[in-house]
Every structure is written in C-alpha cells, then in structure tokens.
Design a protein with these regions (language model features):
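Short alpha-helical donor nucleotide-sugar binding micro-motif in glycosyltransferases
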Residues: 312-317
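Short hydrophobic beta-strand element within catalytic cores of glycosyltransferases
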Residues: 342-345, 355
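Aromatic "clamp/platform" in nucleotide-sugar-dependent glycosyltransferases that forms part
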Residues: 325
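Conserved donor-binding/catalytic core segment of Leloir-type glycosyltransferases
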Residues: 243-261, 267-270
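A short, well-ordered alpha-helix in the C-terminal region of glycosyltransferases
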Residues: 379, 386-401, 407-413
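Nucleotide-activated donor-binding/catalytic signature segment of Leloir-type glycosyltransferases, i.e.
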Residues: 285-308
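A short, active-site helix/loop in glycosyltransferases that binds the activated sugar's phosphate group
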Residues: 144-148, 169-216, 223-233
Length: 429
C-alpha cells in the first residue's frame, strides 16, 4: 500500500503571474488555506503585492529595459489579435525561467495562470522527470493553441489552426505553432489537470493536448467566509454613497471593456428596466464602460482588492449580474453569494454548477441575449421577498460547499495521492 506525505511534510510551489483578477485571488486564497492547514506552501508571482506569509515576488529582470521590452512585445502581439473575439496568449516570453530559479525542488509544482511571466519552453523543460505538476485551470489557455476560451471553435480538439482570435488566421498561424510547442512540452510531464468546474474539466478532456495528462480532477474555488461576509445593506449603501431606496445592480470585472464580460447586454437590459424602477448600476473594475445614456445612475468604484471592502460592495447590491458569454467558474458570483446577494447570470460554462436556478439566483438564456437578462432582472425587482430568500440560500451554499478549508482539504488530498509513489524510498512518511 502506498502512502503520500502528511500535510505538514508536503512542499508545494504555486506560480501565478499576478495577484489581481479572479485567477490571482483564487490562487492566493488556495495558498493561504493550505498554509493554515499546515502544508509547506509557497506562492511565486510577478505582479501585485501581498503581505501573506510564504508569498514571493519574482524580482528578476525588473530593470527599465526589461519593462519596456515586455511592453513592446505585448503591444506587437496585441496588434495580431482579433479584438472582437478575445485575446490570444503566447507561451513564450522574453526571458527564460527555470524551476531552480525559485529555490529548492518541491514535492509538487502547482501552476495557475503564468503567461507574460514564465516562459513555458524553458520552465517546463527544467522540471525534473517524474515530479508531479498540477495545473489548476482558471481558463482554457493551457489546453488550446492560444485562446482563453474557444467558444464555438473546435480546433483545439484535434490541432489548432485558422484561429478566429487572430486578425489573419491561416493553416499554419500562431495557434498552429503554439499547439505544436505545447504538445512537445507536455509530452513526458507528470501532468495532472484540475478544473475549477466540471465544465472546465470536460473541456480540458476534449483537448488533443491533454492526451499527455495523467489525471483529471475538478476542485472548485473556495472563499474565506469570515472575510467575505454579509454587511447590513443600509450601512453598505451609506458607505458607498448609494441611495437607500434605489434598486441596485452590481457588476464587476477586471476589464470593463472586455466583450466577453457582457457589459453591452447588461446596459441594454438596464435601459429597459429603468422605465420600471429607479435604479443604480454599481460598478467595480478598470477600463472603460460603454456609454450610458443617463436613464439610470452609474457609480464607478474603480478597482477594489480588499475582501472586506468587496463585501461592502456586494452587500450594497440587490442583485449581482454576471452577463458573461462564457465563464469557466465565476468567482465574482461566488463572492456575491458569500455576501448574501443573489446572482443573475447567463446559463453558460461553470456558472450553471455554481448557481442553483431559482434557489440562489436566476439563469438567463444566453441565446436570447439581453431580453432574457431583462426578464430575470425584472423578476428580481418585482419579487423582493423571494430575492431576499435567494440571498440567504446563496450564503448558506457557499458556507456548505465552497469554504476555504474544504478547498485546502481537496488539494492536500490530491497532493498526497501524487506524492505517494514519489517518496516511497526516501524515508519520509
């Protein structure tokens, strides 16, 4: 019988490009939960800041030359993309990175979103043979030739080419070369895939690149429910300068202009709703929101990183909207639920697993677009009692199924199973 390492003996290194955005928040939350559990976890990152223990900023190549060179490469690659479709991400970066650059070899390497920091070619090639590599999928970039979400493109299931995310797609375009590179790098890795939803895991299994994966798991993100908590609505609104009697819809995403996040459909729905009730759109995020014609109030709060301030934002809302065309999970929806706010979203991706329709929120029909979103929001307006019950049920669901301790337990059990054979002969138990 094989036994893995005990929690306190596990040495795990996490890698994530930045600590902001859904991926950064989820990665840092996992690391903190593992540390509380006793796992020797260390997280490495390139952008952002944190005062959490065992979190290390990569300070290599921080000179002005490397910053300017990085910006130039990003802008050049950006010009190759089709902005209406979504971003295209390259696996190579401007300088090499190797596992030994970050300290002693751990028992497990856990990758998150690492583009524009870790050069995959040099980094994956530096990992010792047999060392378990867990790749936590926050999107589908690791399993495609460059896109974050294939949407209706099926090329990743065979071999990427003619990529719709590129301005000039062709048979042997960037996606074809990227797919070849990943196929070569994944071959021979002790690779284990963890999807943040069953939907994400199912999509990963469909990728031709994932024939190299040794196992597939689904572990949804978790939250510290003592930090993300319900705030008295009247107090939250007073703190944010929101009128107490208005119907408040919340919306949050890192880039408000990202077409995938659905701001245009949300605004179209709210214009129609403004004829029914006095309302406010409360917005968190950076970037430019599409023009609003003044039929309803818009309050932009900018970017908020503090969970306690985020709790104030979510608690001030009557309903939180996630009008994305696709979401692998929907971390902002989870955060809103933890604060007792019901969620309205499209029936797409991992959102269908997170939200329980008519219990913790409502799911609109993506194919119907803005009219369906309008109907669900209108129902929320005219059913205040049911809406409040949904908010309470949402909080209970997060406490029961998405707590940080449960997240750490699931990952620790995975690490233990992967290290069972690795350390059989080294005297550790």
């Amino acid at each position: 019988m094989k036994f893995g390492l005990k929690d306190e003996s596990l040495r795990v290194r996490h890698f994530v490009t930045e600590l902001t955005g859904g991926t950064g928040v989820a990665s840092l939350g996992l690391h903190k939960a593992l540390v509380r559990r006793g796992v020797e976890s260390r997280l490495h990152y390139r952008f952002g800041s944190s005062n959490a223990s065992q979190v290390t900023l990569d300070q290599r190549h921080c000179s002005r030359f490397w910053r300017l060179w990085g910006r130039y490469v990003i802008s050049r690659r950006w010009r190759q993309q089709n902005p209406e479709r979504g971003i295209f991400i390259h696996s190579r970066w401007i300088y090499p990175s190797r596992l030994h650059n970050f300290g002693p070899t751990p028992d497990v390497v856990n990758l998150h979103l690492v583009f524009r920091w870790l050069d995959l070619s040099s980094f994956l090639s530096s990992i010792p043979e047999g060392l378990p590599v867990v790749w936590s999928l926050h999107d589908l970039h690791p399993v495609t030739g460059g896109c974050i979400h294939p949407i209706d493109c099926q090329h990743f299931t065979v071999h990427c080419h003619d990529c719709p995310n590129l301005k000039r797609p062709r048979k042997r375009d960037c996606s074809w070369h990227e797919f070849n590179l990943k196929d070569r790098l994944y071959r021979g890795l002790n690779l284990h895939i963890v999807g943040n939803s069953e939907w994400t895991t199912a999509q990963a299994r469909r990728s031709a690149l994932m024939r190299h994966a040794r196992s597939f798991q689904t572990i949804p993100p978790g939250l510290d429910t003592e930090q993300f908590t319900c705030v008295e609505k009247s107090c939250a609104r007073q703190a944010l300068g929101v009128a107490s009697k208005k119907f408040v819809v919340g919306f949050c995403c890192p880039d408000l202009s990202d077409p995938n996040k659905g701001a245009l459909m949300l605004l179209e729905s709210l214009r129609a709703l403004a004829a029914e009730i006095e309302m406010t759109l409360l917005v968190v995020g950076s970037g430019k929101l599409p023009a609003v014609d003044g039929k309803f109030e818009v309050i932009k709060l900018g970017t908020i990183h503090s969970p306690r301030l985020q709790s104030v934002f979510y608690s001030a809302c009557d309903v939180f909207a996630v009008p994305s065309r696709i979401e692998s999970f929907g971390l902002t929806a989870l955060e809103a639920m933890a604060c007792g706010t019901p969620v309205v979203a499209f029936r797409t991706g991992g959102l269908t697993e997170l939200l329980v329709h008519e219990e913790t929120g409502l799911l609109a029909d993506l194919a119907a677009g803005a009219p369906s979103l309008f109907e669900t929001l209108s129902w929320m307006i005219h059913h205040p009692s049911e809406r409040q019950n949904m908010g309470r049920a949402a909080r209970l669901r997060v406490e029961r199924e998405f707590g940080a301790s449960l997240l750490a337990q699931r990952y620790a059990e995975l690490y233990q199973s992967l290290t069972a054979s690795t350390h059989l002969g080294d005297g550790r138990s």
